[in-house]
Amino acid sequence: MTENALPLLSAIEWLPEPSPLLTASLLDWLLEADSMTRRFEAHCQKVTVNLLREAFISPEEIAAEAALLPPEKQYWLREIELCADGIPWLVARTLVPESTLVGPEQKLRQLGSVPLGRYLFASSSLTRDFIDVGQSAGLWARRSRLRLAGKPLLLTELFLPASPLYGSLAKENT
């Protein structure tokens, strides 16, 4: 599913606020202000990261996301699969402007198999500008512009079918 899910990150249809599609249990997951890694850890034994891609990419490769970040010559891209007990629950794409990668934020390029949330939410300088909610191929997604010490990065997360988000929807519908 993961290889097939990566292209879905670029095909997400972002919903207007408010949308009648957004139930209370969906909003509880999609508007989570804390670390999604931490939220997942409450539902499994172990959360791990499978690193799918890390590289500098050009502005042409970020298409619609460019409007949400400052113009740069290149951006650091990190695409991962977040697994719970070995089962993929989420794919994520992080875009970091090159100008963000100075000072302590250089560590964003060296996370490897460390979940982004563990790094971000350990910082006292983390803020979030917004959370957008959307869908792609029937799967739910969210997008956030976060700031570390005022420097932006964009995180897009797509919840895979095994994610507990969908379990909460099933309970809501019974």
UniProtKB/Swiss-Prot annotation:
Name this polypeptide is given: Chorismate pyruvate-lyase
Lineage: Bacteria, Pseudomonadati, Pseudomonadota, Gammaproteobacteria, Enterobacterales
Any GO CC annotation of this UniProt entry: cytosol
Complex and partners: Monomer.
InterPro entries named among the record's database cross-references: Chorismate--pyruvate_lyase, Chorismate_lyase_/UTRA_dom_sf
Similarity remark: Belongs to the UbiC family.
Record field: catalytic activity: chorismate = 4-hydroxybenzoate + pyruvate
GO molecular function terms listed in the Swiss-Prot or TrEMBL record: chorismate lyase activity
GO biological process, alphabetically ordered: pyruvate biosynthetic process; ubiquinone biosynthetic process
